[in-house]
Amino acid sequence: AAEVATMRRFGESGRFIGLSDTWTLNEDWFTAVSVGAGDGAAYLPRYRVDGFVNRKLLASRQWVATLGAGYYRAPDGHIDRNISLGSTYYFESPWVVQAEVRFNNSSPGQVRTHQQFVAATWGRAKQTQVIARHGWGAEGYQAIGGGASLVNFDSRQTQLTLRQWVGPQWGFTAGVERYSNPFYDRNGAKLSLFWELP
């Protein structure tokens, strides 16, 4: 799948492009890889790479356990490396619930933090999906423009996203979010287009 997004934060416009793909190894195992890059905006990655290994559990294979790893390089030079553990349960349509914890090591300074999130999805792929997500925990670094960064702080983020297919392989996502940390609060919106490779 491919995604192109545009946004504006801290008085600076930014654009992000991402690519992702999933490979089915057998009826129980599958993997996923995503790569992405920003256009130089301070709050977007210069580039990032994330990979996941997934194992279907139970006789029904409705429960999926996930192990992930990621690398994030920011325009200001700091680097994040993370490992994540996740769990997803597919109820009878149209509900899916998900939880994840991520352990992050940021440099310079070897700042170690962790975050977690829970999410619920209503709807069906290739049609309409509504996703509610809440995350909380600590962040190692966050660029806020003008060469300034926040270091090792707690934050919370709540998002509501609509993912709508327009054609067999493409559509759009539209979402709103509420983000807060000890230094500022942010309310925002995001609009992006996606295209799923055949």
Where are these regions (language model features)?
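Repeated loop/turn-to-beta-strand initiation elements of outer-membrane beta-barrel proteins
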Residues: 1-2, 27-33, 58-66, 93-99, ...
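Transmembrane beta-barrel strands of outer-membrane/channel proteins
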Residues: 2-6, 19, 33-37, 49-51, ...
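Outer-membrane beta-barrel domain signature
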Residues: 5-12, 20, 36-44, 56-60, ...
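Outer-membrane beta-barrel "beta-signal"
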Residues: 120, 186-198
